[in-house]
């Protein structure tokens, strides 16, 4: 069995979870979210067009881990440095033996691997970020692309996880296409190429904050992460900064769940994006949602179509966002 990489990509059946396994969904390290708007104190931070903006941090005043005193400064800093982790949206043009379809196959597969290893959500975002930043600086032959993905996930695990998959597990899941020496050599090359810089904000960092601003319940949270996971696979989404991708995912999720356009002043204030600024990215996400279960790259759809993720993939896409696509 071969594919566009020239190497076998497989996930061992023993590592797969049954799609209907009733395992509860948890997202690690998310900020406290509230399904009841009454739980969040209404504090008028700024009156824009007569609409109240909620102080989304008042409920965490007694939670030292929420660092309420610094949270706004932290996110202002994240917005300032997020572009350092972005790559050219045309970097694949410089690759001699790769194309964007191969990247999509790799990321789709890694999303399944990430799920089977039950890793934290931020690990996936960092994995894809490391892949893109590495490929933007280093030419890679297609038979080594899967190795790049495995090593990126290994590094992301070492940075984010408490328990890290052992190298032998990675070798096994790649059907022994690579040796331990291959993995360790690629790990060294990747770290040197990236100058050991692994602490740049990904879309996940912004998702936590923006979901809190949206007062997201579990359903909205799952739909937003479903949409942003779909976006990870798509090379064309590299033209958007992580904060915009996160904001668009929350906006599109709100539209998907409610059935109408929904972006209030609290969301606009805390994301610093207006609805108009999100529409281009949001419409792309709706398109990804429409085709999620079709074609060969269905890893995200299978993941979110399981009981573990509350069958989120079965929700109807917000197609009404596409209706005014060609209008000014």
From Swiss-Prot:
Database matches in CDD domains: CYCLIN_AtCycB-like_rpt1 (cd20567), CYCLIN_AtCycB-like_rpt2 (cd20511)
Cell division listed as a keyword: yes
Assigned keywords, A-Z: Cell cycle, Cell division, Cyclin, Mitosis
Transmembrane parts of this sequence: none
Keyword flag Cell division: yes
Tissue specificity as recorded in UniProt: Only expressed in organs with dividing cells.
GO terms under biological process: cell division; mitotic cell cycle phase transition
InterPro entries assigned to the protein according to its UniProt record, in alphabetical order: Cyclin, Cyclin-like_dom, Cyclin-like_sf, Cyclin_A/B-like, Cyclin_C-dom, Cyclin_N, Cyclins_cyclin-box
Role according to the record: Essential for the control of the cell cycle at the G2/M (mitosis) transition.
Subunit composition and interactions: Interacts with the CDC2 protein kinase to form a serine/threonine kinase holoenzyme complex also known as maturation promoting factor (MPF). The cyclin subunit imparts substrate specificity to the complex.
PANTHER family: CYCLINS
Family classification: Belongs to the cyclin family. Cyclin AB subfamily.
Protein's UniProt name: G2/mitotic-specific cyclin-2
């Amino acid at each position: 069995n071969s594919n566009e990489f020239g190497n076998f990509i497989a996930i061992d059946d023993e590592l797969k979870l049954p799609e209907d396994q009733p395992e509860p969904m948890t997202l690690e390290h998310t900020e406290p979210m509230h399904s009841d708007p009454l739980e969040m104190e209404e504090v008028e931070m700024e009156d824009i067009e007569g609409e109240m903006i909620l102080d989304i941090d008042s409920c965490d005043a007694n939670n030292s881990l929420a660092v309420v005193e610094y949270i706004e400064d932290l996110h202002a800093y994240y917005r300032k440095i997020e572009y350092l982790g972005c790559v050219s949206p045309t970097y694949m043009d410089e690759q001699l033996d790769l194309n964007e379809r191969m990247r999509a196959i790799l990321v789709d597969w890694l999303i399944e691997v990430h799920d089977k290893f039950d890793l934290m959500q931020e690990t996936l975002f960092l994995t894809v970020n490391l892949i893109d930043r590495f490929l933007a600086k280093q030419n890679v032959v297609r038979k080594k692309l899967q190795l790049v993905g495995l090593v990126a996930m290994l590094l992301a695990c070492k940075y984010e996880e408490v328990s890290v998959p052992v190298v032998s597990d990675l070798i096994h899941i790649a059907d022994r296409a690579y040796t331990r020496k291959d993995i360790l050599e690629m790990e060294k090359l990747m770290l040197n190429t990236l100058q050991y810089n692994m602490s740049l904000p990904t879309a996940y960092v912004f998702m936590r904050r923006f979901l809190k601003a949206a007062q997201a319940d579990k359903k909205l949270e799952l739909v937003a992460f479903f949409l942003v996971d779909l976006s990870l696979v798509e090379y064309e989404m590299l033209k958007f900064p992580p904060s915009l991708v996160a904001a668009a995912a929350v906006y599109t999720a709100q539209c998907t769940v409610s059935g109408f356009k929904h972006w209030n002043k609290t969301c606009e204030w805390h994301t610093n994006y207006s609805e108009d600024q999100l529409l281009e990215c949001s419409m792309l996400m709706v398109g990804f949602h429409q085709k999620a279960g079709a074609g060969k790259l269905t890893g995200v759809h299978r993941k979110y179509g399981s009981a573990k993720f509350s069958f989120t993939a079965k929700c109807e896409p917000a197609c009404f966002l596409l209706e005014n696509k060609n209008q000014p």
